[in-house]
Amino acid sequence: MPTPSNAIEINDGSHKSGRSTRRSGSRSAHDDGLDSFSKGDSGAGASAGSSNSRFRHRKISVKQHLKIYLPNDLKHLDKDELQQREVVEIETGVEKNEEKEVHLHRILQMGSGHTKHKDYIPTPDASMTWNEYDKFYTGSFQETTSYIKFSATVEDCCGTNYNMDERDETFLNEQVNKGSSDILTEDEFEILCSSFEHAIHERQPFLSMDPESILSFEELKPTLIKSDMADFNLRNQLNHEINSHKTHFITQFDPVSQMNTRPLIQLIEKFGSKIYDYWRERKIEVNGYEIFPQLKFERPGEKEEIDPYVCFRRREVRHPRKTRRIDILNSQRLRALHQELKNAKDLALLVAKRENVSLNWINDELKIFDQRVKIKNLKRSLNISGEDDDLINHKRKRPTIVTVEQREAELRKAELKRAAAAAAAAKAKNNKRNNQLEDKSSRLTKQQQQQLLQQQQQQQQNALKTENGKQLANASSSSTSQPITSHVYVKLPSSKIPDIVLEDVDALLNSKEKNARKFVQEKMEKRKIEDADVFFNLTDDPFNPVFDMSLPKNFSTSNVPFASIASSKFQIDRSFYSSHLPEYLKGISDDIRIYDSNGRSRNKDNYNLDTKRIKKTELYDPFQENLEIHSREYPIKFRKRVGRSNIKYVDRMPNFTTSSTKSACSLMDFVDFDSIEKEQYSREGSNDTDSINVYDSKYDEFVRLYDKWKYDSPQNEYGIKFSDEPARLNQISNDTQVIRFGTMLGTKSYEQLREATIKYRRDYITRLKQKHIQHLQQQQQQQQQQQQQAQQQKQKSQNNNSNSSNSLKKLNDSLINSEAKQNSSITQKNSS
C-alpha cells in the first residue's frame, strides 16, 4: 500500500523525539531484537532485547481481549506469539502514557516481517490547496499590541453553543419570519436553541436511551424561565449596586452578538412553542444526542484510555501527603485570597459607581446648557437685555470645613496671643513703675527704700499664689469635664499602617465555645474532687439513669436533696438505664436495662414493670411530695353537631382525664355559658351593624379567661414553681436561695451607695477648696489695696513735711535778711 508523503513512519518518526538521543545503544539493540523476532531467529539481538525489556506482570483488565488456548494447542504455538509480549515493550521514543495510542499500539503488535507493506499513523492530508480560500477568508491581519486583552474564558466569548445551518435558515425565513412584522434574528434563534439544549440536558440527561420521551414545551418552560431569571437577577443586582437606571444592562463579558438581542423571556413567550417543535424533531432525529456534536472530553471517574476520540486527557498527579500544618496554611491562603477577591470586587463596584455619577453629572450639565440656550433665545425674542455670561458656569467658592481640632488650635493660638499681650503690657507697666521708684528712691531714705523692696517681694509672692490657684482650678475643671473627641478621618502613610490579620467570625465563635466548654469542664472536675466519694449528685438530667431508692426514716424528703451538705446514707436498690431514651419515651423502642445495688445486670422479666410508668420515669421526682403534672388541656370537652333545620349545637362535658381529685374545679361555677349562647344567637339573628363593646361581651371575656388559664400558670410542665428553680439549680433550699439573693442585692446596693457617697464627698471637698482659694485671693487683693493706700498717704505726708520745712527756711532766711538790713541801717545811722 503506498504511503502518503506526510505519513509518519515508525522506523524514522518514532526515533526523532527529544528522549531518543540518550538511549541510542539500547534502541539499536531493541531494533535488532525486533528484526530477530520477525525472522524467527534466536540470536544475540533477541537476548539483548529481552534483557532490556520493561515487562511487568499486570492485573488482568476487563477491557483487554485475551486469547484462550487449550492444552492441545500449546505444541502448535509459534515462537513469535510466545515472545510477542516483549515486542510491545520496545523503546518507542515517546512518553509512557502516549505509548498506548491506538495506531502506535497496533503497529508495535503487528511488527513482524510477514507483512510486506509498512503501517503508518494517519494524519490529515495537507498537500492539496483550496481554490476558494480567498472567497471565504477576506481581510488583512493586524498584529495586536499585546497578547492578552482580558481574562475571560473561551466560553464567555464564543457566544451560544448552537450554530445555525442551511436547514435552520430555511425554516427561519419560510415559517417564522415570513409575512410577520416582528422578525426573529439569527442570533436570537441560536439563543433559543441553545437554551433548549441546556434545559433538556438538565432535566433529561439520559435522553439518548429513549428519545421519544422528550418533554413538551409546557413542561420545559419553567426550567427555561428559571435559568434566565438567575442571569436576569444577577444583572439587576449589579444595576442596583452601581445606582444605574438602565433597562438594558450589558457587561463586558457579554458577546457582541447578544448586545442587540431581546431578553430570553420575551423570546420564549413569542417564538418559544413554534421553534421548540422544530428543534424537538431535530433532537429526535439524532437519537437524543446533541444536534451539533461537541468535543469528547475525559469524564471524571472514568478511564477511557482505549477511545482515541477523547481529547485533553488529564495527567495523573501524585497527591502530596497532607498534614495539619499544610491544611492550616492552605486555609489561611484561601482566606487571604477570598479577602483580596472581595476587595477587588468592592473596588470595581466603587469605580463603576464613580463613573456612573460622573456620567450623570455630564448629562445634567448638558441639559442645563440646553435650557440656558433656550432662555437666551427667549430673552432675545422678548428684547430683554442680559449679561453675556449667562451660558457660563460661574465657579463657586469651596466651603471651608473647620474640624473640631482646628477650632481648638485656633482658640489656643488666640489665648496665647492674649496672654503674650497681657504679659507685655504688665512688663511695660512694671518697668515704668520701677523707673518711677528709682527716681523717688534717689530722694528717699534707706528705711523707705527697704519698705518699698519688701512691698515688691510681697506682690510677687501674691502673684505666684494666684497663678497656682488658677492652675489648680483649671486642673479640677478639666478632670471633671469630658475630653472632646474628633471624628475627622486621618489618613496615615502606607509605611505606618499596621499589618493586621483580621480574624474570622467562625474562629472567634469556635474559640468562645471552646473556652466555655473548658470552663464548665474545669468546674465539674473541681466539684468532683471536692465531693470525692462522700457525696453524690442528683440532678434533673433526663439522660441520667433512674433509681429505686430506699430513703431513711429520719430524713425529710422535701429538703434532703436541696440541702447545702448532701447526705450519703441513701441506698440505691435498682437503677434503670436506656441507651435510646428519646425513642423509648416515644414508644418506638423498648430497650431498658436494670441494675441492682451492686451494679449487676438483672433480667427485666423478673420484675413486674409497668411500661407506662417506666416511660414517665424521667418526669418523676421521688423527693417531691404531692407531685402534680399540670396539663395545658382544656378542662371541658366540647362537641359540635348539626341538628334538624341545620341548627348547630355545642355540647360540653367535663374532662375527667385532666381534672384532679384534690382540686376539682369546673368553669361552670364562674362562666355563664347560657349568656354566651344568647349573645351569639342574638348577633346572628339581628341586622344590627353596631359592634358590642369588648368589655361587655361575654364571649370575649370567656376567651380571655381561657388564655389566662392556659398561659398564666405559676408552675412549669413538671409541677415545680418557677421561683423554686434557681434553688433547685444551685442544689440548695429555697430559703437559702432567698437569703443569698437578698444579701447579693444588699451588697450591690451598699456598693452603689458607697460609690455615690465617695463621689459626693470628692465633689464637696473640691468645692470647699475652690471657695477657700477664692477667699484667699480676695484677702490678698484687699491687702494689696490697703498697702497701696498707706503708701500714698505716707508719700503725701512726706511731701507736706518737706513743704513746711521749706517754708520755715524761707521765713528764717527772710527774717535773717531783714535783721541784717536793720543792723546795716543802724550801723549806717550810727556812723552818720
UniProtKB/Swiss-Prot annotation:
GO BP, sorted A to Z: chromatin remodeling; DNA repair; DNA-templated transcription; positive regulation of macroautophagy; regulation of transcription by RNA polymerase II
Bias kind Polar residues: ranges: 462-475, 819-832
Record's compositionally biased regions (Low complexity): 36-53, 447-461, 776-818
GO CC terms in record: NuA4 histone acetyltransferase complex; nucleosome; nucleus; piccolo histone acetyltransferase complex
InterPro entries cross-referenced by the UniProt entry: Enhancer_polycomb (IPR024943), Enhancer_polycomb-like_N (IPR019542)
Database matches in Pfam families: EPL1
Entry keywords, A to Z: Cell cycle, DNA damage, DNA repair, Nucleus, Transcription, Transcription regulation
The keyword Chloroplast is assigned to this record: no
UniProt main location, coarse: nucleus
Biased amino acid composition, Basic residues: 16-25
Region annotated Disordered, chain positions: 1-56, 422-483, 776-832
Note: Present with 1110 molecules/cell in log phase SD medium.
Family: Belongs to the enhancer of polycomb family.
Subunit architecture: Component of the NuA4 histone acetyltransferase complex composed of at least ACT1, ARP4, YAF9, VID21, SWC4, EAF3, EAF5, EAF6, EAF7, EPL1, ESA1, TRA1 and YNG2.
Function: Component of the NuA4 histone acetyltransferase complex which is involved in transcriptional activation of selected genes principally by acetylation of nucleosomal histone H4 and H2A. The NuA4 complex is also involved in DNA repair. Involved in gene silencing by neighboring heterochromatin, blockage of the silencing spreading along the chromosome, and required for cell cycle progression through G2/M.
Species this chain originates from: Saccharomyces cerevisiae (strain ATCC 204508 / S288c) (Baker's yeast)
Protein known as: Enhancer of polycomb-like protein 1
Subcellular location: Nucleus
